[in-house]
Amino acid sequence: MRTLALAAGLCACAAHAQEVPPPAYQLAAQRAGVPSTVLYAVALQESGIRRNGRIVPWPWSLNVAGQSHRFATRADACAGLQQAMRSTQHTRIDAGLGQINLGYHQQRYASPCDLLDPYRNLAIAAEILKEQHTTGEDWLLAIGRYHRPAGGEPAARYRRSVSRHLARVQGTRPTAAALVAHQEKSP
């Protein structure tokens, strides 16, 4: 019985263990002044794929007019991005770990394929998160505005989705009360 109780306790602890964001996320977050767990949770939402039984952000991800595309290499992703740009309005194309929008953030990169550099993409995503955050407010509100600066229901849906990733990374559970409170605070 004692062994069973110990095993159950270990399983419960493992289910809520904190996941440390990889060093690249920590560095980009530190430079921008945002929590690394927030940046990592956003990347999980934006470009996450299942690999070896875990969800991980994928650097060579594109979203073109609502359709997700994953590539094996940066070169393949760049070719896919260039092809998409010939036929799709740039405001309908997102690229990289943080799914940076080509049209709305064109001032942040020199060449569209720069967004497929994981370090550059994370730096831009962290900058956007920082710009959307107001001192003293919950980071979930900034997360919603990262997705949709105008707020509203699309931002609230995005917040709810990212909050699940954030809770996993932080080793906590998202509570219904917290999600409702975040929803009520949003414009």
Please state what every model-predicted region is.
Residues 18-175, 187:
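Catalytic glycan-binding domains that act on GlcNAc-containing polysaccharides
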